[in-house]
Regions:
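Basic, polyanion-binding surface patches
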Residues: 1-154
């Protein structure tokens, strides 16, 4: 199947917008907007994330390290845009969106799912990361930022 046909078909798959965040062993902070995040199992609670091998967060997501899946609210498009742009990479943590006291997380996200990396697998251009959920927190009402067809949904 040609890559272009697959890309067109995937534009019809609506999904919530998530930012993956982590801190490596030397204290450097990383964040990226992720399009491939899904729950994996409920017993034990686990989540699956796919990260391009070229992403700067890639090397921070190793077995035993912590990460956070930040599911964004509708008013957090700016955070998504900053965390998806190579040009804005240096600005990702230069704002008050974050709590960086431990595993970095977005303070007012729709939900924060904290994980410890349990397994990673290489698959062509990506690393598949399985996170064992340690705890989570979420907003009281549903206001999730959604994305499809190359843009944010109302």
């Amino acid at each position: 199947m040609p890559k272009e046909q697959f890309l067109i078909a995937m534009r019809f798959l609506a999904s919530s917008v998530s930012v993956i965040s982590a801190k490596n062993s030397s204290g450097s902070l990383f964040a990226m907007t992720a399009s491939s995040v899904t729950s994996l199992t409920m017993d034990p609670p686990s989540i699956l994330v796919c990260v391009n091998n070229g992403a700067t967060i890639h090397d921070a997501l190793t077995k035993g390290e912590n990460l956070c899946i930040n599911i964004l609210q509708k008013n957090q498009q700016e955070i998504s845009n900053i965390c998806s742009s190579k040009e804005l990479e240096s600005q990702r943590f230069q704002n008050d969106f974050w709590d960086v006291s431990d595993t970095p997380f977005i303070k007012d996200a729709q939900a924060n799912i904290f994980c410890k990396v349990d397994e990673t697998f290489a698959y062509h251009t990506h690393k598949i990361v399985i996170g064992s959920v340690t705890h989570s927190q979420s907003a009281d009402t549903f206001n999730t930022l959604m994305y499809a067809d190359g843009g944010y949904l109302d």
